[in-house]
UniProtKB/Swiss-Prot annotation:
Record-linked Gene3D superfamilies: Jacalin-like lectin domain (2.100.10.30)
The protein, known as: Jacalin-related lectin 10
Organism name: Arabidopsis thaliana
Matching InterPro entries: Jacalin-like_lectin_dom (IPR001229), Jacalin-like_lectin_dom_plant (IPR033734), Jacalin-like_lectin_dom_sf (IPR036404)
Keyword Signal: yes
Signal sequence bounds: 1-23
Family statement: Belongs to the jacalin lectin family.
The keyword Repeat appears for this protein: yes
Domain called Jacalin-type lectin: residue spans: 24-165, 168-312
SUPFAM superfamilies: Mannose-binding lectins
Disulfide bonds: none
Molecular function GO labels: carbohydrate binding
CDD domains recorded: Jacalin (cd09612)
Keywords: Lectin, Repeat, Signal
Length: 315
């Protein structure tokens, strides 16, 4: 089996009305037959993939896209004959997106099988890849697929993709989900430079976060200031914050659920001391290949809950 990898060096930029690059167009790979088709790059995400297959290979492909929160029903590329239709759904409402596509085509130039990978899962191989040439589209860290193009006639002959920068994703909120007041630093930062944690013998009181944004330091503070304070410095941009671990438990005297301890980890393998008191349910906020670029949570008399925003670590 021959394997071909197609990344950004076989591509062109799609420019929007402001003169900025909206998407990167990856050349279509596969056979030379059929007529060209192009769904364009004016989408926010892909919602669903439809593939019709038969004895000759993939007969057609079709996509549902997302634009401004609504799904768009795109055209069928190819024709429908006797065979079977398989689908692959992307949970775009929960920040899932396609990151790459593996494909297989035969000597006649007919696409035989496709496999889609998202930031959360991988589809089954749709079709039959035996005795074919394999290729890969995408797989670029920090990028997502927002559109497709290619060629098709009586079968699907080739496929290419449009890539754009992937948005930050939001973790679950852990800890006391009803106590205190909500706060949200957002995700519009380049990275985290320093975290200051204030704690007492039984719980976390507050966190103070220094973010970097366009070369400037932006500081956000959440919680109560009384207690012991320690700092954990991240050597951004040479190092990234990648993980927050900790525990949460009920305070017996107050019957409220709060964050009891915190630990931070970086992309260089450094681990902070344990701040606070380890007690109760353990949690880990981490996403492979991603850095933490923002925090949100709840606080009142104590530091009640914490969540983070992830963004891909630059290649």
């Amino acid at each position: 089996m021959v394997i071909i990898y197609i990344f950004l060096f076989l591509s062109s930029a799609i420019i929007d009305s402001t003169g900025l690059a909206k998407a990167q167009k990856l050349d279509a790979i596969g056979g030379k037959g059929g007529k060209q088709w192009d769904d364009g790059a004016d989408h926010d995400n892909v919602a669903k993939v439809y593939i019709r297959g038969g004895l000759e290979g993939i007969q057609y492909i079709k996509f549902d896209y997302v634009k401004d929160g609504k799904t768009i029903d795109a055209s069928i590329h190819g024709v429908s004959g006797s065979g079977f239709t398989q689908t692959f759904e992307i949970d775009y409402q929960n920040s899932e997106y396609i990151v790459s596509v593996d494909g297989y085509y035969d000597k006649s130039g007919t696409m035989q099988a496709l496999e889609f990978k998202t930031n959360l899962k991988t589809s089954e191989v749709i079709g039959y890849p035996k005795g074919t040439t394999k290729f890969s589209l995408g797989g670029v860290n920090g990028k997502m697929v927002i559109g497709f193009h290619g060629s098709a006639g009586k079968v699907l002959n080739s496929i290419g993709a449009y890539l754009t920068t992937a948005p930050p994703t939001k973790s679950q909120l852990v800890g006391g989900l009803t106590g205190g007041e909500p706060w949200d630093d957002g995700s519009n930062y380049d990275g985290v430079k320093k975290i200051s944690v204030t704690y007492i013998s039984t719980l976390i009181r507050s966190i103070n976060v220094d973010y970097e944004k366009d070369g400037q330091v932006v500081t956000r503070y959440h919680g109560m200031k009384n207690g012991d304070t320690e700092e954990f410095v991240i050597d951004y941009p040479n190092e990234y914050l990648i993980s927050v671990e900790g525990t949460y438990n009920i305070l017996p005297d107050d019957n409220v659920l709060v964050i009891r301890s915190l630990i931070f980890k970086t992309s260089k393998g450094r681990i902070s001391p344990t701040y606070g008191f380890v007690s109760g349910t353990k949690f880990v906020l981490e996403s492979q290949g991603n850095a933490i670029v923002g925090f949100y949570g709840r606080d009142g008399g104590a530091f009640d809950a914490i969540g983070v925003y992830f963004s891909p670590i630059p290649s």
